[in-house]
Amino acid sequence: MTESGSYKDTVNLPKTSFDMRANAIKREPEIQKFWEENKIYDRLFENNPGELFILHDGPPYANGSLHIGHALNKILKDIINRYQMLRGRKVRYVPGWDCHGLPIELKVLQNMKSAERQNLTPLQLRQKAKEFGLATVDNQRQNFKRYGIWGDWDNPYLTLKPEYEAAQIGVFGQMFLKGYIYRGLKPVHWSPSSKTALAEAELEYPEGHVSRSIYAAFPVTSLAEAVKPLLAEYQSDLGVAIWTTTPWTIPGNLAVAVNADLNYAVVEVSQSEAQSKFKYLIVAADLVERLSSTLGLELTLKATFKGNDLEHTTYRHPLFDRESPIVVGGDYITTESGTGLVHTAPGHGQEDYIVGQRYGLPILAPVDDNGNFTQEAGEFAGLNVLGDGNQAVIDALAAAGSLLKEEPYPHKYPYDWRTKKPTIFRATEQWFASVEGFREEALKAIATVKWIPAQGENRITPMVAERSDWCISRQRSWGVPIPVFYDEATGEPLLNEEIINHVQGIIAEKGSDAWWELSVEELLPESYRQNGKSYRRGTDTMDVWFDSGSSWASVVQQRPELRYPADIYLEGSDQHRGWFQSSLLTSVAVNDIAPYKTVLTHGFALDEQGRKMSKSEGNVVDPNTIIEGGKNQKVEPAYGADVLRLWVSSVDYSGDVRIGKNIIKQMNDVRGKIRNTARFLLGSLDDFDPEKDTVPFEELPELDRYMLHRITEVFEEVTEAFESFQFFRFFQTVQNFCVVDLSNFYLDVAKDRLYISAKDAFRRRSCQTVLKIALDNLARAIAPVLSHTAEDIWQYLPYKTPYKSVFEAGWVQVEEKWRNPELAEFWSELRKIRDKVNKTLEIYRLQKTIGSSLEAKVVVHVFDERLRQRLQALNPNTHGSVEKSNGVDELRYLFLASQVEVPSEPIFEEGDDAGIYIQVYKADGEKCDRCWNYSTHVGESAEHPLICERCVAALAGEF
């Protein structure tokens, strides 16, 4: 006779050394070392049979530490790359860095004493900037690798490398030779604080900017023929009324523009209230009422006419002795604000410049690099246009009787993105890329690209359709030089194919420092050295957007293992006006095609409340703290890279995304659930040899075949999620599969089969057959996201596998024959009944009628006859059940109860909606000492009097 409690060693409990805790701070670096030592990334590139897949990296700026936006971006890229590797494609990912430009220059200058700065040569500055950039690259590279990002980290692309710079000069050269690059005096965004021109992408428009706006009038000196008869009587006291938010541009005024199609009016000003000297004003007819209240003047309508008729009327400048014309502008002139007549200064505005060109007006911009008025501004010379210069102009207009009103005007105004100070529009000699020359081709190219989300196309299309020519020159020394020389005598630029090729060769060999190191003679081709002229080298460098925008040529086209155009570019949505656009423009200008086939964009990372992150708010989430933990590990535990990666997969990145302590904690819980599920699977397969223990599909019990159907559905949904880049669908599906399908259902039901049966029993091996399929596929499916966890699982597989790494095992594998919608429909119904049974058992448990569910006998009354008969068929102890039980598809196992009855004549309670009524009684018989089920057969075996008939059979190897 066996005594109580001594059966515990006869039960097959799960066995695995796979740790329940992730212990990521120790385990992840070990796994990364395993990948590196076994060269998994390189081996996949060599051995994968599929075609190339090239995701081209948009270069982060080599300045400062990584933030959560960097993590979001790089992890998204890595998820895509790893998925493509698992699908068998050859993936080569070359990370890059943007290393030139003003921000790095400013960092270097900020770290120097002002005395040092005074004596700094361009070459010394470049040397310091290079050192700073390279140190940042090293720091960022280490962090990116810790995120688990795979790539060519030993051979990244840097925009400061000679081979990169030379290819960039090549792009510039081809654009120049096609006639797309020219030098011109044009108004550009000028930053007095940085003393350089800026491109659109280098501007920001902070909230809260208020300008001093003024209404002013200029005296009419002659009338156009079309309005002479109508307006002659008012001419002696007539002024054209304008409105501007930049009074300092009035010294540059050379015209007033009207809209040809708008109606204009002459109004009489009630003299008592007027502070200006004009009795009559010309304004837009639709604005008379609004202006009357804004200016606080009574305005009486005298005559109306079309804007077109005003063309060639002239007026006198209120502050300078010159006459200027009224001209017809474009549809930028509206009655939304102002007076309907626009003060036009061709040296200070884009539209002004275009209109000025049409009328042959000179370009006047009496402002220097520092933002101070020049001698051309007469009495205002030396004053700063954004400060006392603005005030002086307003005062002078008032003194001249020209000012009608001044009022503050809040609006969006461009600031320098680095110095955070306002910019001005100012005409300077610059180098431009003429977008006009290839705009149509660029728009056509946009239409060939797949944009995800689709509205990306609607963002970039109007930007390219409406953008002005691209100012590509910068007055700074840390960058790639524009390879031009100027004739000392005439100032004429010298730039042609021979010059470009010669300079390109020098830079390929020596790097762009050579432009500053070598003499002009050495930089010039032989034929220009002794031709009787003397030249000086240009001092401008290229816009950094031209640097990064040339990466398709410097990297994708130049490296033999890559392929142009790239399959995909993926960056933040701000890059529609940045890198996506500069890359598109250069690629189309040179090759007539887009440099990418697909463009994917993501939003920005906000805190948990949806606020922007800022140091002052104290709501900045540092990716490094998530991975390695903070100073106080109790408050900020080390979660490891996989939790950060899981967060990236959980958000809908097509818009802005949120992150914070609570969200990260949730992610850690989800990873825990996935690990626990995997651990149970590993432990339950400890003694399973797939070669000899696998049960053929046709012989599997219904429950197992249903589970394989679910596995097919789940992993198809996961595949679809990765294919469509909707990783949040992967996150939801896998989490749901682990918790709802496995833990709460299949594994819950399986424990009896796995623990209680004989090791080799059919009911146990059939279950293990399904568990192996679930485990292999779960590891593969999470590998793109939870890369370390997946590899960890793979390294603990208890059975032989031909694949050293999960990434060599390929993608999930499901079979078409597993799909069985009819079976699934019935089992879904069963699962609903199971939920109902569980709820009822819970009520009885709370009433203390039963303890565990095994203490219960469950009676299920089913109203629907067809369903009742199907349930009875799964219940061997129901009268009328003909099939012998397979020890799996029984209701008692499904409900975890000791006995289940399905009466042929059901009874009903009122209010039962689903036609199912459940009763719970205490189970019949005694508790088995081994499986804890209740049975009326406990005690029948003389050898084992304390256990039930199932356990007696199991010990004999028969169950």
UniProtKB/Swiss-Prot annotation:
Q: Could you say which residues bind Zn(2+) here? A: C928, C931, C948, C951
Residues forming the motif 'KMSKS' region are: 612-616
Q: Tell me the superkingdom of the source.
A: Bacteria
Q: Has keyword Protein biosynthesis?
A: yes
Can the keyword Thylakoid be found in this entry's annotation? no
- Pfam families reported in the protein's UniProt record: Anticodon_1, tRNA-synt_1, zf-FPG_IleRS
Give the GO terms filed under biological process for this record: isoleucyl-tRNA aminoacylation
Task: Please give the start and end residues of each transmembrane region.
Answer: none
Q: Recorded GO terms, molecular function?
A: aminoacyl-tRNA deacylase activity; ATP binding; isoleucine-tRNA ligase activity; tRNA binding; zinc ion binding
Residues the entry annotates as binding ATP: K615
Residue positions annotated to bind L-isoleucyl-5'-AMP are E571
Where does it live in the cell?
A: Cytoplasm
One GO CC term, this protein: cytoplasm
Q: How is the cofactor bound?
A: Binds 1 zinc ion per subunit.
Please state the Enzyme Commission number of this protein. Answer: 6.1.1.5
Q: What is its main location?
A: cytoplasm
Name the catalysed reactions. tRNA(Ile) + L-isoleucine + ATP = L-isoleucyl-tRNA(Ile) + AMP + diphosphate
Query: Which UniProt keywords are given for this protein, alphabetically ordered?
Result: Aminoacyl-tRNA synthetase, ATP-binding, Cytoplasm, Ligase, Metal-binding, Nucleotide-binding, Protein biosynthesis, Zinc
Q: Which PANTHER family match?
A: ISOLEUCINE--TRNA LIGASE, MITOCHONDRIAL, SOLEUCYL-TRNA SYNTHETASE
The Swiss-Prot or TrEMBL record describes its family as follows: Belongs to the class-I aminoacyl-tRNA synthetase family. IleS type 1 subfamily.
| Entries under HAMAP family matching the protein | Ile_tRNA_synth_type1 (MF_02002)
Function text: Catalyzes the attachment of isoleucine to tRNA(Ile). As IleRS can inadvertently accommodate and process structurally similar amino acids such as valine, to avoid such errors it has two additional distinct tRNA(Ile)-dependent editing activities. One activity is designated as 'pretransfer' editing and involves the hydrolysis of activated Val-AMP. The other activity is designated 'posttransfer' editing and involves deacylation of mischarged Val-tRNA(Ile).
- Domain text from the record? IleRS has two distinct active sites: one for aminoacylation and one for editing. The misactivated valine is translocated from the active site to the editing site, which sterically excludes the correctly activated isoleucine. The single editing site contains two valyl binding pockets, one specific for each substrate (Val-AMP or Val-tRNA(Ile)).
Q: How does it assemble?
A: Monomer.
Name the record gives this protein: Isoleucine--tRNA ligase
The beginning of the lineage is: Bacteria, Bacillati, Cyanobacteriota, Cyanophyceae, Nostocales
